[in-house]
Amino acid sequence: MNRFIDRVVLHLAAGDGGNGCVSVHREKFKPLGGPDGGNGGHGGDIILEVTAQVHTLLDFHFHPHVKAERGANGAGDHRNGARGKDLVLEVPPGTVVLNEKGETLADLTSVGMKFIAAAGGNGGLGNAALASKARKAPGFALIGEPGEAHDLILELKSMADVGLVGFPSAGKSSLISVMSAAKPKIGDYPFTTLQPNLGVVNVGHETFTMADVPGLIPGASEGKGLGLDFLRHIERTSVLVHVVDTATMDPGRDPISDIEALEAELAAYQSALDEDTGLGDLSQRPRLVVLNKADVPEAEELAEFLKEDIEKQFGWPVFIISAVARKGLDPLKYKLLEIVQDARKKRPKEKAESVIIKPKAVDHRTKGQFQIKPDPEVQGGFIITGEKPERWILQTDFENDEAVGYLADRLAKLGIEDGLRKAGAHVGANVTIGGISFEWEPMTTAGDDPVLTGRGTDVRLEQTSRISAAERKRASQVRRGLIDELDYGEDQEASRERWEG
């Protein structure tokens, strides 16, 4: 059984960037070949693309978790890692993309439009790209950045010109079936239609689309019946058509009270909308009234009697038809086409943009690229935020002392160490950047040259109380029983207390 799904939550994870490579060129008769580690590949993006071949969000309902391909790691001999393959998700026209807060990120209305739903992470630089005059053979590389991971909400709003609204069993499905090639389910019981139906109406050489939404009842805005969720499919319509059942025998119902009840529910739905569809308020949208089931003699007599009263009270054109007998359809078609064409002329032309990218603020000045704030949870601690320092933290291999020293140089050059001094930070203060906390020990002042040191090491770290990678490795071997606990080298005796502590 086909299911119509018009709202889903996607859990997206773009591809992580590949890691850079640490490699030194080795060749006969070339003792100083230099670094030749390649860069990691960019992680794959997750892209939403509009296609006419898809009409529902059903696939995402069953497969909401989506992950793109990771970028390949770099290799020696200057070989860069391959870029992760982009993952393209096909969506139907009229798909609206929202974030977790309900804010609209993109409105995908035209076939071919694309939206980058989650961007892949940048690949890490290899040691060849990190080489400089001061650091000619880096013994480290940068780690690939993680891809974006977040949840997005997709909502489908039908791209119809005409929207049919009415009580259950008013004949909306019958009307769309005789005016177009649509084949909706039709029955003589309430709520036969459980999903929107879309049909194309031909009028001479012109066409327009018509949407039939499930029936409304008084109190739908409070969740009665099928509620108002399906009304999102008439938000884009140029004209609304009230389909009224003139043959109903329900007590307390008549055509005028039916119209008033439906208008009250539409007003309740409009008040709940927090975005502009570009077509104005639903209450200002042109309306028509269709008095259906004129094939029943009593119903036709009632329709003729009330037609003038409805036109005077509401000011809308009124048509008496019979969908079953195909009576009175042509005048209705031509009137709807006239209103739709007029609305199309007034509608602003869409810009031919195939790709939509979320805008991001870019500050090319050094000042303002980071912020230092007191840590509310740690006495005397600080939290540093900013795109660059948080990204650099993710790129750093903290098992490599030289990589940590390189990070310190970058942070100092950005002005963070000077900023911490001005903020009143003391040596040993707890500093948090991008979820990583460490004790602050000033190493470099802004503008100083990098410290020359051996590959994979940094002499500044040896002068501090920081446990080195070699010490951590030996402590791990002791815990696993691979070496004797008292088997320390002469140069490591001083660190024994730190291991045990």
Swiss-Prot record:
Known function: An essential GTPase which binds GTP, GDP and possibly (p)ppGpp with moderate affinity, with high nucleotide exchange rates and a fairly low GTP hydrolysis rate. Plays a role in control of the cell cycle, stress response, ribosome biogenesis and in those bacteria that undergo differentiation, in morphogenesis control.
Subcellular location, record wording: Cytoplasm
Pfam families cross-referenced by the UniProt entry: DUF1967, GTP1_OBG, MMR_HSR1
Gene3D superfamilies, sorted: GTP-binding protein OBG, C-terminal domain (3.30.300.350), GTP1/OBG domain (2.70.210.12), P-loop containing nucleotide triphosphate hydrolases (3.40.50.300)
Principal subcellular localization: cytoplasm
InterPro entries: G_OBG, GTP-bd, GTP-bd_Obg/CgtA, GTP-bd_prot_GTP1/OBG_C_sf, GTP1-OBG_CS, GTP1_OBG_dom, GTP1_OBG_dom_sf, OBG_GTPase
Cellular component, GO annotation: cytoplasm
Requisite cofactors: Mg(2+)
Top-level class of the enzyme under EC nomenclature: hydrolase
Positions annotated to bind GTP: 166-173, 191-195, 212-215, 292-295, 322-324
Protein name, as recorded: GTPase Obg
GO MF, one example: GTP binding
Domain Obg: 2-159
Quaternary structure and interacting proteins, as annotated: Monomer.
Keywords recorded for this protein, A-Z: Cytoplasm, GTP-binding, Hydrolase, Magnesium, Metal-binding, Nucleotide-binding
Domain OBG-type G: from-to ranges: 160-341
GO biological process, one term: ribosome biogenesis
Domain OCT: 362-442
Family membership noted in the UniProt record: Belongs to the TRAFAC class OBG-HflX-like GTPase superfamily. OBG GTPase family.
EC number: 3.6.5.-
HAMAP family: GTPase_Obg
Binding, Mg(2+): S173, T193
